[in-house]
Amino acid sequence: MGVAGVAIDTVEDMARLFDGIALDRTTVSMTMNGAVLPIMAAFVVAAEEQGVPPERIGGTIQNDILKEYMVRNTWIFEPEPSMRIVADVALWLARHAPRFNALSVSGYHFQEAGADAVLELALTLSNGRAYVDTLAARGMPADEACSRLSFFFGVGSDFYTEIAKLRAARLLWTEIAHACGARSARACALRMHCQTSGWSLTAQEPENNIVRVTAQAMAAAFGGTQSLHTNAYDEALALPSAAAARLARNTQLILQHETGLCDTVDPWAGSYMMESLTDGIATRVRAELAAIDAQGGVIAAIESGWVKRRLLHAAAETQAQVDSGRRTVVGVNRYVASDPTDAFMVREMDGRHVRAGQMRRIAAVKAARDPARVATALRRLADAARDGAGNLLALAIDCMRARATVGECTRALESVWPRHAAAVDANGEGAYGDHRRGDAAWRAATGRVGRLARRTGRRPRIVIAKLGQDGHDRGAAVVAAALEDAGFDVLRLPLFQQPASVAAAAQAHGADIVGISSLSGAHLELVEGLLDELALHRAGMPVVLGGIFPAADARHLKAKGIAATFGPGTPLDAIAQALCACIEQARCARPADGAS
């Protein structure tokens, strides 16, 4: 807790977050999807208690639940009730808080999950179209529905393609909005926010990321973004330091105020190269939109696993290109520093301390409230979910006024709607290995896995899991696909595991090794908990950790018993070799352990 966002459980938390900030003079953007009802409600109530009525608040709530089922995974309920929540939030804000945008349709997460420019646009625009259809079914006119959407795109390092992508997005959205019945200029204009690529940041020589972010920010400006977030150069290591965050902010200020970059609208218009690239992307996106329609629409494409498979294969191919050197990443697979250092100062947070403080604050809120009023408000929220009557955001606001917590609101809805149970898709046979055939390093890795399998009489078994609330699964999915192609027997567990459940699954599977993927900063507490669980059950399999973590944390976990750690940029052939070594070492140690 406290290492991947701010903890908001009550109105008091929201008020503390915005203490000293006048909410009638500040626009607020919140990335919230699964728990959008209580979080938006807490913000509305905190503003009210600051003296700012709903009609005077401004900002954006992401409220883009469809992409959560595809990539980010912060869903709670099944798609159907979740789409009702999306619509209720949009309808309430349209009536009571018209300056607050109800939907920010995200393509950024698709790029982070592996999508190229075409697939990113197709999935994003398809989701936008689905939201407009949902709002239209609830009685909102097409012009109003389309005008209440904004879009959020990632901007990577393929400079010209990224500019063309943003230009094509505006063209395509105009076509979609018009097809939905919109006619006003505002409804047919695509409003966008962009963020530089997180996936492209490297832990090796992180100063190089300053150049990457600058080039990406230039592409976003040339492409016509209305607002921009520039990532900090040290985000591949940990939470950004204050100095790195300031430099990221200043990067776009320098581009805006010192270069003249923003003085001309669409400066690439008329370039044969740019116009043909834009037209080509738009044509390919239209074909992808038709393919989604052929699946039965975007929700059907989610439920069939079509979207996840497309993203996995795209991400695996990209990783194979990097690992083989066919795609250059300076400082990682070419022009590598001869004396790499990990001496960067990174921001550290004590999650246990943050959680203890948060629990005390929640207890204080509960002690001061009227329990009967809370129970009545929560019951009305659940009743509205059950019978379909009433606006869920309005009722969630009543709950937060009574000082219900975010968790209590969620549990009230959960009493009516069961949690979404996401299936773990197949690892995608050949998704990675097919792109490395003939590669000497890959042949060496698969050869070692094969020799280990012949010695033991079966393929080496690995369980891959993500612990806690970490929903970023691109890395885990690609590693699972690559290891299966290398010859491992891979069991990839569903998201949001606890140490005890991973230990039980590893024992039931007869695993030789357990791999944990961590991108949320919660690795210390959770991985140590897993080691304790395995020790409790006398399970001798080694545990390895991959993801983003400071070097000091890696050393700490190795001292606690982790067999190996793999940071960003580790080639998957090297990971396969290291896993074999860990398994072999553990097997050699078992007789001695048994004798003791």
Language model segments and positions:
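Catalytic alpha/beta active-site cores
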Residues: 1-156, 180-193, 221, 227-231, ...
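The C-terminal output helix
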Residues: 581-594
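Alpha-helix capping and helix-loop boundary segments enriched in small/acidic/polar residues
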Residues: 1-9, 30-34, 70-84, 109-123, ...
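Active-site capping/gating regions of soluble enzymes
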Residues: 122-127, 131, 150-334
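Flexible, glycine-rich loop/tail regions that form catalytic "lids" or insertion modules at the edges
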Residues: 242, 253, 257-442, 507, ...
